[in-house]
């Protein structure tokens, strides 16, 4: 059965430059913050980093000197079985319930579970829909 919860993810938006990822990850390391999930996107003149961390307050404090903007985004975090078709089951369930998935990123290794982070049109409803996946 899936472990599904509402979490707050950090969106860090900053001017794009070579080394930004290094700057961000070093700042978080120096603050003692663990990164549970990350997504990073180059949007031309700016970069967007999505960070699910062990401590959002420390994350914000650590990123502030880097000159970007820190926002909090409520997301659904689901830890599900690592097997073929698991994401298809989730995607179909959400589609059938009329829920839009605006953003998704996931991590997978050879471990028995996968962590999926989703920004949707109704996080509360998603949590209820995925409890038995």
Predicted features and spans:
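A conserved regulatory-domain signal marking ACT and ACT-like small-molecule sensing domains
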Residues: 1-133
């Amino acid at each position: 059965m899936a472990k599904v919860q509402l979490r707050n993810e950090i969106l860090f938006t900053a001017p794009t430059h070579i080394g930004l990822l290094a700057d961000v990850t070093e700042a978080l390391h120096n603050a003692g913050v663990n990164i549970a999930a990350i997504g990073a996107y180059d949007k031309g003149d700016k970069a967007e980093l999505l960070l699910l961390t062990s401590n959002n307050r420390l994350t914000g404090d650590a990123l502030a000197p880097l000159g970007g903007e820190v926002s909090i985004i409520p997301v659904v975090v689901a830890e599900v079985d690592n097997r073929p078709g698991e994401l298809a089951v989730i995607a179909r369930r959400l589609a059938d319930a009329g829920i839009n998935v605006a953003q998704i990123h996931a991590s997978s290794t050879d471990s028995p579970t996968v962590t999926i982070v989703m920004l949707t049109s109704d996080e509360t409803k998603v949590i209820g829909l995925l409890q038995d996946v």
